[in-house]
A protein has these predicted regions:
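Feature captures the catalytic ectodomains and active-site-proximal regions of enzymes
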Residues: 1-427
Length: 427
């Protein structure tokens, strides 16, 4: 049973933030999209903009989501690799080394596609993972487990039983780099780009050894995959081969945090499909409802119906909708606009009367189509519910949010404090 009289529905539109785009009337995808349901909600609530981590940081989703859920990622021992391993169900023990991976396309010493065309099927991924997991040379190098998650994405865990491993290593991925305790998206990265080498980030023997193992592992994986029958077939039909494994965001520890219930007394649940959000939910001690990665109107509708049902039992229902992020990465303005419209028509249309509940809608980061990656642009924020006065916003867009009464919120972790204050001030 929930504790709050007025539950909170917290909806994150992955990567929805964008920039005015020439050729589309200098509009953003949110501005160009038809979103009558979101706009109706915006007219009833209050808006603003938020830097999900902080100004100047282009966060990955893990840092953005942790922050939105009240945890300052710059103070955590945060690893996307560990979070995804936990979310995908791989056994992870202290001392193991976990990494987030992509099947990618390498050619002539360069990465030409970080996602192997973004069309690796579940069957193809399963065959490629099996080839890696059963290779004797790789097994002779180190004990490990590679698991396919969704599409080109994988989680990888090196077992630390036989030797010490270090997370103080650079990413073997040209698009992301470590900055302090978090990973940020690099700006201005263009492909093809040279295959990066993993290097130690300190002078310890264990960091040097771990970096050396990763470089050996990457080279051996490439030799295993380049002539695999899956890739022979992909090349024959004109697709990019999935012949390289990008590895990033190493970690050896699970983030040590108070649960959401310990912090706020909230009983929470996450509705999600991606391993990173599911892993975060497990780390902060909230329940999960797992959906297949269905971006159709029906898929969004099912999530809306489930969110409403869960609000009868939980204080906080967190819903993560991936749709807008991928077309942003692909520079596909029309695709991102359609994803937003589908979410409005499928998900938000099912919510009905939320006058006795609190609604928060925002994003974990911006993924502008012109940038084709994450940026540090602030994202729009909408909060509505009992006692929240309308500020006159007519639409849920970046431009209206900049004029909203919440103003500029400097850190995403401030949002949960606002929601707690609102939810506990209404009898």
């Amino acid at each position: 049973m929930r504790n709050l009289a007025h539950p909170i529905l917290f909806v994150v539109l992955d990567g929805v933030g964008d920039r005015p785009t020439p050729g589309y009337g200098n509009k953003t995808p949110l501005e160009a999209a038809s979103t009558p349901n979101l706009d109706n909600l915006a007219a009833k609530g209050r808006t603003g903009i938020v830097y999900t981590v902080k100004r100047g940081v282009a966060p990955e989703s893990d840092a953005g989501v942790f922050s939105l859920l009240s945890y300052d990622p710059t103070r955590l021992e945060l690893s996307r690799g560990v979070v995804e391993a936990i979310g995908s169900g791989i056994e992870f023990n202290p001392g193991d080394l976990a990494l987030r991976c992509n099947f990618a396309t390498a050619q002539g010493g360069q990465i030409v596609d970080r996602r192997a065309g973004r069309n690796v099927s579940p069957d193809e991924a399963a065959q490629l993972v099996e080839a890696v997991n059963t290779n004797e040379k790789l097994r002779g190098l180190i004990d490990f487990e590679l698991k396919s998650t969704i599409g080109h994405r994988c989680a990888l865990v090196f077992r630390g039983r036989a030797m010490r491993l270090s997370a103080a290593i650079s990413n073997l991925d040209p698009a992301y780099e470590r900055q302090g305790k978090i990973t940020i998206a690099k700006t201005g990265v263009k492909l093809p780009a040279p295959i990066p080498k993993c290097v130690p980030l300190n002078k310890t023997t264990v960091a040097r050894r771990t970096a050396h193992i990763l470089n050996q592992f990457a080279s051996l994986v490439n030799s295993v995959l380049k002539d695999h029958k899956v890739n022979v077939s992909r090349i024959e039909r004109g697709d990019q081969p999935a012949n390289f494994l990008l590895m990033r965001d190493a970690g050896t520890k699970t983030p040590n945090v108070k649960t959401l219930k310990q912090k706020f007394g909230f009983r929470g649940v996450a509705v999600a499909d991606m391993p990173v959000e599911l892993g975060i939910a497990k780390v902060i001690g909230i329940d999960t409802r797992i959906f297949p990665p269905d971006r159709s109107l029906e898929g969004y509708s099912q999530r809306g119906v489930e969110a409403l049902r869960l609000m009868g039992d939980y204080d906080l229902v967190y819903v993560h909708l991936k749709g807008p992020d991928e077309p942003g990465h692909d520079g596909d303005f029309e695709g991102k606009k359609k994803a937003i419209e589908d979410i409005d028509a499928g998900f938000f249309s099912r919510l009905g009367d939320l006058s006795s509940s609190f609604l928060c809608v925002t994003a974990d980061h911006s993924t502008p189509c012109l940038a084709k990656g994450h940026t540090d642009d602030p994202v729009p924020l909408l909060i509505s519910g009992p006692g929240v006065r309308s500020d006159g916003s007519m639409r849920f867009t970046e431009a209206y949010a900049k004029k909203g009464k919440f103003g500029t919120i400097k850190h995403g972790y401030e949002i949960m404090r606002i929601l707690r204050r609102l939810s506990t001030s209404i009898a």
